[in-house]
Amino acid sequence: MWQNQNTVGYAEVDRLYIDYNANDVQVTVGRQRIAWGTSWVWNSTDLFNPLSILDFDYEELPGNDALRVQYYTGAVSKIEFALAPDRKKNKLTSAALISYNAFDYDFNFIAGIKNNRWITGFSWVGDIQGAGFRGEVTIQEKPERLSEYELLYSQFELQPISYSNKNLFSFVLSGDYTFPNSFYIHTEVLYNNIGKEENTALFSLEAKEIGLLSPSRFSVYQEFSYNISPLTRASAFGIYNPGDKSFVIVPSINYSVITNLDLYLISLIFDGKKFTQYGDYGTSFIARIKYSF
């Protein structure tokens, strides 16, 4: 809407779609959210709307201009197909999902095309003794060589990620538990077989272009939160890159001032050496007041 040296104003249409239902079939056309992932930080099976845990101010979550057809084969099972063009990159994402429940777990199997390359995988969500247990696994066709990154990497005697000549394998494992006193703990790990362990920040743009959730080989997420009072919740999470030893820590406090009015205080603390994944962003402190109506 506007932008100057001190302020930025913007507007976003998050959802605008037509929804049609006929017996066990549901057809949705327009801007919608297609959330196939089961993990809460990294979603390798979420082909249409992957999340960014650091985008804390986008609570509505991103949508996609897509066609979605769902056929419900039972109370907790379905077959789904979705198609979404990317007008900016002249690419198409299309995929099918089969979802069913067994042994008190929900299982999803996917197969499709993303970034003009085939991708397949599966995910699950359930619990072990009251603790949430989730995971996602994907295998994707190796990317084309992105030679436009050669000049940048040659200064550091490095090669683009896309030159690895390997199919992409991604694995996410997640667990969480809430104690009776409201104390919450959540741990999640991500593995990318072609991710980097050094100079990770240099590979961020290329990693995003070829579909990696992170340019690093390993990533570890840890979160703790607790209700200080009925109106106040404190939380802190961190992401650590074991390869380059960089990290980000994000403490926050959410306070309900009055009905429908919330005060949110958050800080993003990045640390690491130059060219590490989280080493070049410094520290930010943010206050947000939100009124809901």
Predicted features by range, described:
Residues 1-78, 272:
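Outer membrane beta-barrel
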Residues 9-14, 21, 61-65, 90-94, ...:
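Residues that define the transmembrane beta-barrel architecture of outer-membrane proteins
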Residues 19-22, 71-73, 99-102, 113, ...:
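Residue-level signature of outer-membrane beta-barrel architecture
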Residues 24-27, 76-79, 104-109, 130-134, ...:
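Repeated loop/turn-to-beta-strand initiation elements of outer-membrane beta-barrel proteins
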Residues 29-31, 81-85, 109-113, 135-139, ...:
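Transmembrane beta-barrel strands of outer-membrane/channel proteins
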Residues 125-239:
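Detector for outer-membrane/organellar transmembrane beta-barrel domains
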Residues 226, 255, 261-262, 266-269, ...:
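Outer-membrane beta-barrel "beta-signal"
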